């Protein structure tokens, strides 16, 4: 005979385990817990006793409420409408019903109040589930149906036993179209069919009792509540006794008039009294499985539902231990509305939480499809402007062959190309600073004559500075290292009451950029050519610069006092480059001078003034100054100092100015003789103090009256320069990336260049960059004007670089730090020495080359077989010498058949280190015995040779 667990039996019968234990005990079976087992006989007795133990169904109705109930058949109607007669079927059942129903009194009053407030005239009571003691015999798939009615006289519905099987089959889940719900969640049947509520097996019937407020806001689909004692609960409120007074149907509802409900069931008789209020059809709470999830876990039949841990957690945060009955009716109703209004948006501290919607793809208007950029734009910013993903643009760039990232800077052309693929246009709205600072042409009557600006050019050591020194009658060449002019000098010379401004440029090949700048700011070029040397490479370069700038040339043939001077040969060589003397029918003035003997200097100055008169040089001194930076340097006492050649207007002390990316105020000015001046007119060179940084040679100097505008222009230039620097980074294609991987063994030499003036910095850096080869790359990682500081040493330490100082010295702390960190600092005064030393350092980075050195050769004349050694060759040294540790190759008919090391070298059984020419010896080859008479053994060694660039 099989056994059945009590817990499984309770689940099968749909009642609580304790109830099953009580019934088994009443039947005489000793079952103590849910894990106990009973036989089939006990199960049969317990199942057979279920109908006899079912108690009455009590439904209490207020004096003005009539309960309408759908019946499965017409035969059941008299029973439903008969007077209520409560007949307890078992002695224990009524007691359970009364005891368990007591705790539900507050909830019933609260629910009735909510129902009264929710409808207009009559009250609607919420259907409560039948207690387990009364409905223990009800099938797990059946439940009492809620009802709504209205009546003037009291009525009581009869309690009737419910059969074990329902009279009508269970209906499927009700569709939303046949459901009605009012805020407050009172379920109203609209169709006449019976809709029994199917409970989940093992859960037991619907609960009753005082559960407190539900988290779901008051929806209760548990059927009619069990009857309680009238004296415990007090009078129930009626629809007309609400404290707020009767509310007309549909008149005060903010939602407007409610639509009429579906037609009534023809089989059901109309109850006496007023017509029930028509209710609007809204969404009902979830049915079936979803409803069972909402109702919670198993509950005891017939008793008050006990809160589970989840229910307590939900109610504890909101109510903090207080029942919903302690809230006011209005607050409770508003909470019910908030919780069950599907269109209500939750609000927290005034902030709305809106549900995120799907992103709608829209096409921007034509005017919005124009992207405005300033010179450059990053890929991420361009993607943001176009509203697409940056990865799409990166893929497009990769298809074009460029490896880029989201922060890669695109120039205008690349941005146009990318944007056009997505239907966008790119417009360059960069501010043209040249237009802002452009000077309008002056009226002819405002122009005044100005001195000419003369630039002296020529090859190295052809006497340019000596000639200028002779003209100025001042010995400035003594301060130049090696007789080479290192940077531009600007000077004023007066002749016959007229001034001439001279610019001296270096002749070294590294100073090409400085010569080009000098040609652009000058009016006349004096080309100095040594009579004993002729036309040299820098002479040709100066001619090309002058022609490119459209500046007239005056040739000064210097050093005519030397015995080997040949001026005619110089004129002939100049003719080959398009410089034809006026004596030979050309348009170029040539003057033979001697700077050392001071010959024909005045004639040269007169020719300069004559050429200036022909050019009719004029300028307007009565306006804001504009000029060019000839040179910039960092003075230890005065800070950044700029040599400015004023070209237009007058520069005064106190003027605001813009120079490149710097803006400042002119604090002081002094001329080439060190004298302080308050104003500088056109064609006058001055040194300006007051700039925040060292400007680059060749920058335009503009004086302004508004400090704010000067700062704005400088800021814009800084932004533009930063964008251009980012865009300078080489765009690496896939092929270039592959080549870079292949060249992974290339050596790098990092260099930091510091000099006294900006021009020297440029010259040294450019000369060093030209030393780069495919084997060794030279990277100039930093250049600046001024002394070597601790910052430079830190940078050199981090980047493993050497520091080259040109005409400067390191600071004391920087020198100590360099010695501590092992940073190499090289100081030079002549650019040749710097270039040579760096070239040697680059050669030191190269791997040494192994070169074969020939030692000698020997002929095999006899072969000896030695046990445990092998074959030994008896040789005669024909040439050179054979060393013990030398490498050898075996030649047979001038073909190399073996190359390796010499195993043994002996003379008369003695090991020797070497054997010279003319001697005989025995030699054994390492791991090789195939030797024959007549073979030649050639000895050599590999030695390291330093690699050259």
UniProtKB/Swiss-Prot annotation:
Q: What is this protein called?
A: Translation initiation factor IF-2
Which organism's genome codes for this protein? Answer: Trichlorobacter lovleyi (strain ATCC BAA-1151 / DSM 17278 / SZ) (Geobacter lovleyi)
Biased composition (Low complexity) is annotated at 152-162, 263-276
> Any transmembrane segments, and where?
none
Domain of life (superkingdom):
Bacteria
Name the segments for region: G1. Answer: 458-465
One family name in Pfam for this protein? EF-G_D2
Report one GO cellular component: cytosol
Q: Where is this region: G3?
A: 504-507
Q: Which family does it belong to?
A: Belongs to the TRAFAC class translation factor GTPase superfamily. Classic translation factor GTPase family. IF-2 subfamily.
Question: Which CDD domains does this UniProt record tie to the protein?
Answer: IF2_eIF5B, IF2_mtIF2_II, mtIF2_IVc
**Composition bias type Pro residues, residue spans:** 163-172
Q: What Gene3D superfamilies is this protein classified in?
A: 1.10.10.2480, P-loop containing nucleotide triphosphate hydrolases, Translation factors, Translation initiation factor IF- 2, domain 3
User: Chief location of this protein?
Assistant: cytoplasm
* UniProt region (G5), positions on chain: 594-596
